[in-house]
Amino acid sequence: MKTITACDLGIEVTDALGVFRWLLASFLMGKRIRSAVAVEAYRILVDQKGLDTPLKLARTSHSTLIRLLGQVGYARYDQSTARRLLGLSKKVEAELDAQLDALREASNAEGFKRWLLSFEGVGPKTVEIFMREGLGQLTMLHGH
């Protein structure tokens, strides 16, 4: 199976918005669901519905997210995934800039990983997917 990259999804992890989009994609791909379903969910949420910022996603109703996730096959996971996506978007909106500043100042990849793991529904697999591309791009972004 082909590894999905940020580039495959049209994501440039060069700023906070790109970090959010890649985190969203990594979150979806980190679930026990086929990667094609996760990619389709990302495309519907971001490309079709324009939920491409933490604030836009946070302002989406739980029932709307359940419906959108259900369209692509998250039937077993739609309730919990929708709830966790709302939590993720709110926490990213509140904390991402500070986390990026801390990463830039201290080059603290482990601290950034711990922050990612603090999200409900984010486990080692999601962090692995995110860090595969996210860390390299972030360190280049911050000149380290």
What are these language model-derived features?
Residues 10-21, 32-33, 75-80:
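Structural motif
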Residues 22, 39-40, 110:
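A generic alpha-helix surface/boundary motif
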Residues 1-9:
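Intrinsically disordered, low-complexity, charged terminal extensions of DNA damage-control enzymes
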Residues 22-31, 87:
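Short, hydrophobic/amphipathic alpha-helical patches that form generic packing surfaces
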Residues 30-40, 92-98, 136-139:
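Short helix-capping/linker segments at secondary-structure and domain boundaries
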Residues 41-45:
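Short Gly/aromatic-enriched secondary-structure transition segments
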Residues 28, 107-144:
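Catalytic DNA-binding helix-loop module of base-excision-repair DNA glycosylases/AP lyases
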Residues 48-120, 132:
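Alpha-helical ds-nucleic-acid-binding substructure associated with the helix-hairpin-helix region
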